[in-house]
Amino acid sequence: MPHDPSFAPTQLAARAAYLLRGNDLGAMTTAAPLLYPHMWSWDAAFVAIGLAPLSVERAVVELDTLLSAQWSNGMIPHIVFANGVDGYFPGPARWACSTLSADAPRTHQTSGIMQPPVHAIAVQRILDHARTRGRSTRAVAESFLDRRWDALVAWHRWLAECRDQNDNGRVTIYHGWESGMDNSPRWDSAYANVIPGDVPEYQRQDNKINTDASQRPSDLEYDRYLWLVEEMKAARYDDELLPKAVSFAVEDVFVSAILSVACQVLAEIGEDHKQPDADVKDLYSWAQRFRTGVITTSDERTGAARDYDVRADRWIATETVAQFAPLLCGGLPHDRERALLRLLEGPRFCGHPDLAYALVPSTSPVSRDFRPREYWRGPVWPVMTWLFSWCFARRGWAERSAILRREGLRQASDGTFAEYYEPFTGEPLGSMQQSWTAAAVLDWLG
């Protein structure tokens, strides 16, 4: 797809739909055709959101495929590997999940970690679209909910029980990949304390596909990423052993906010569709617990949220998109929330005078950690724009939501459907033809 900055909404929607069809392997959609040729967990949820206005039935298939690879302990793995597809590292042999863990599925090859739990939002969007269709389409969506309700609750229960063992109301991650924000400055200090041992030899694939080194993590960073995988493998991915076995452990405030929102959304779905009262009660309880956990981290003056390094026993305060986690789940005192909104909309983030679009950069342009081309250290991610816009609409902030949608569509109108964008120039970066970027556009255009 050649770069063209002038696609009208109807053209853009058609191109986005064409992209998703092109990335469709039948029962799963690749995150991107070259760099990410498999199914990623939170990508799949966003893909389902984009598929829903095109075909509720196909959106259901996407989530069905993902949930069919769920571990028996409830975890949804961050990658479900497509059969017969190579070209990605680390692949299933490196993870060795089915060999090491009794919880891993035997019918699918997966990774051994998770990603942010946005899936309930996808279920909500599928049900929203199904309500506007015929009876048979509504039946497909409702049948999916009945069939997968237990799996969805088990996923949230696993996060609440196995990843918040101290009841702090915050999800502990054991790898930066679990955050979805792989190389964010949020993890710099925690990764600095990861001392790689004897990492088995490996060949990266990502920097062969995207050859601009300024856009990808370094080899030293990859050594640390892979050493953490080795530590998890040594613990056989056991939920009881990971807290002691892995040298990276951080309470992730952004994932915690997403979990709070997801539990609230799923509880409301459960009430509307007469699911078991005990499940609904648990979901509401978890939503409140993680909302409180997020709010507890916030700065009293600015409202900015912080992560917590469990290994170093200290708070991590960074000028990244994650500090706005309380705006997703709510719960801040009014004055503190207004202060956090001023920070978001001011010159340190969306109001920075040099931004091409008034969107949230992954790291503040005024931070010393800011790198405008490098992954989660500066670029603007359309999928983050979508998430903030959706959460703001849910919270009743219609104008703020509409501004993000408008600016997000302006950015995406180049038609590249890039993974992320340079915040000052608007240059598309990372993987092109990224499925979740197309999905965001399709949901915005409805």
Residue ranges and their predicted role:
Residues A44, A48, P116, A120-V123, ...:
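TPR repeat positional signature
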Residues G50, A122-R125, H129, A262-V265, ...:
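Core register positions within helices of long alpha-helical scaffolds
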Residues P2-H38, L66-R106, R170-V250, R289-V380, ...:
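Extended glycan-interaction surfaces of carbohydrate-active proteins
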Residues A245-R289, F370, E374-E399:
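Long, repeat-rich segments with strong aromatic
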Residues P5-R15, S55-S68, G134-A160, A262, ...:
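Extended, well-ordered alpha-helical scaffold segments
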Residues L100-T132, L387-C391:
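Hydrophobic/aromatic-rich effector regions of fungal transcription factors
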Residues Q115-Y191:
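Internal, well-ordered domain-core segments that constitute the primary functional module
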Residues A44-G74, A322-P333, T385-S401, R405:
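Alpha-helical support elements that line or immediately flank enzyme active sites
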